[in-house]
Amino acid sequence: MKTRKILALLMAVLMLVGCLAACGGDGGSTTETQAASGSTGEAVVTESWTEEQIAQMGEAIKGEAGGSAVSLKIWGPELAQDVLKSQAEAFKALFADYADINLEVAVQGENDAAANIINDPKAAADVFGFPSDQLTKLNNANALAECYFPENVTADNTAASVAAASVDGKVMAYPETGDNSYILVYDKSLVSDEQAKSLEGVFEACEAAKKKFIMDSGNGFFTCMYLYTGGLVTEGFEEDGMTQKFNDYDINQVTASVKAFADLFTANKDYFESADTTAVADGFKNGTTAAGIAGSWNIAAVKEALGDNAGFAILPTININGTDTQIINMFGYKFIGVNSQSAYPITAQILAYYLTNEDCQMQRAEKLDWAPSNAAAQDSDFVKNNASMSALMAQTEFSIPQTALAGTFWDPLAALGTYMIEPTNDFSTEAVQAEVEACIAGIRDE
């Protein structure tokens, strides 16, 4: 991080708000802080920030506070509350010499974050987590404040995550994770690594063990694999900026892919279950499940349930008209955004930057199994030697970016996925093609 660039950015912001606080600082802050009581009790280090840089940020916060307390609300998912609270307390301690900072950490599902920010921005959180596909919606509603540290974010994170966080060349959010996707998880005592290479092999193992394979076919985030594997690709929006644009796909190939999944599910109806991804870890725990498709947010629970028998791999192949075809899925990122109507924009920006720095990303990797977007963190031995993170990173080669998706994208996919898991439905080529065409038309709102 370049000290001069931070200084220039913060001074420019301070001048804009009429605050002329000096950014020299008294050097009283340290590069390691202890989380306050009520959190996890573990230190959150900030080794990537020098004391001079912390002092500059502290003076900016002090100037914004103007002798009063700064109060901010943070939204994050339920699974991350303990870690988020610990990091929030560490942030307060880091800048305690400069201002009285009150941070409220509240549960807010990331999938609904954008809607709640847009519906009532003044009552919403100042800093919040959200998935990459919601960036366009938030930006179009002018709900996001542009990042104050674009050059630093670009230098710290992978190029792909920064590109996904940008609109028209402007960085609009702080990359938090580089793993918003899903992989195959399995019980290694029941499913061999070789069987895990193909969906047919996975079902073969499930049948032998008399146990389930679970995936959430009623969720468009997972259902999209049926279309993507057949060659359909999302390519942003049409000229109107709203209608989903697709590549020049072959409807026959897409239909063949969808039919292959439907036929395989039907043939293995006794061992296939469509359920929320939390059911995968629960199934491992109670001994009813041999394999499943789990989101990155469920990996820690899978590891807890299976221990040394936890297996992780990229999504398997599926046989389509005699050809083993790699399953293609959706891969996205999680971001932390700053509410454009925050009463304390400078402190909110520094907080968002802090929560996404290398050290905080590494703590989430260690505690939550969230793979980082930070390039240095990705290069750490911990991440490189982590089987689930390695599988998630490898899956990116076979994924479509979770960006620039229309608001109409999800419901038609969910309907298609629900249709496919009912064994009594008509899965003739003609019937499947009609469902595929209806799904695509629904996504395009035609």
Put a short name on every predicted segment.
Residues 243-275:
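Glycine-centered hinge/linker elements that transmit conformational signals in sensory
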Residues 90, 94-157, 189-194, 290-291:
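Extracytoplasmic "Venus flytrap"/periplasmic binding protein-like
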Residues 393-446:
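Conserved C-terminal helix/tail region of periplasmic/extracytoplasmic solute-binding proteins
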Residues 170-176, 182, 201-247, 289:
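Extracytoplasmic/periplasmic solute-binding protein
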Residues 43-47, 67-79, 99-106, 127, ...:
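Short, well-ordered beta-strand elements
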Residues 38-64, 130-182, 194-204, 313-314:
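Hinge/lid segment of periplasmic solute-binding proteins
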Residues 118-119, 123-126, 154-186, 211-215, ...:
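A structural signal for short loop-to-beta-strand junctions that line the ligand-binding cleft
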Residues 93, 304-367:
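Extracytoplasmic/periplasmic substrate-recognition and gating elements
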